[in-house]
């Protein structure tokens, strides 16, 4: 049977462009489709349209489609916003009352300084009792383990500043460059974002028009959504590629 289309995950990586190029060299009639299974990063330069790009990409939110169309060189017809196949009503994480570490940390002492400043400038009882959640791929990283020690030691010494109540059950803290904060917002979490570098880490309103951003302290920001379902359209439990017209 003749191949009509090639569909593969797409994160803007060079090797993915090479695959799409190779497919077109074999047969120009084959349609190439990239599926963005995650969320665009804070600074989405990897997704600038360039040689080897797929003919069409599927994204899981209207806000992401607009970013690609308005800022990254993609034509409107080349980007389709679909209901997420990854972020579903059933497949959801526990985001409540946690401190999420990113994959990459440059300077853990700098991050800890921003974290400590946030806590000391918050009203006692405003934040819930928090637990550290390290990135699963970084459980042996010296920087991550050092930051974990600093944060947990500080939390223990200042435990009287934290209290669980009905108003703060959905508060969590996210550190560095992470897409998890977007999923958390779409699932009703009040997200606080500690940015090691605001250029690379912050979700700017200039790109993410459906997010309200408020600076809390230096390099620390709180997010709220203007409207749910714009950054990510959470999928139903039974959706698959079979439900899509590609």
Language-model features and meaning:
Residues 8-12, 36-37, 59-62, 101-107, ...:
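Structural motif
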Residues 1-83, 179-181:
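Active-site and donor-binding regions of nucleotide-sugar-utilizing enzymes
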Residues 74-150:
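Conserved catalytic-core segment of nucleotide-activated headgroup transferases in glycan assembly
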Residues 156-168, 219:
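Short acidic low-complexity segments
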Residues 54, 72-81, 148-149, 170-171, ...:
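Catalytic binding pocket for nucleotide-activated donors in carbohydrate/polymer assembly enzymes
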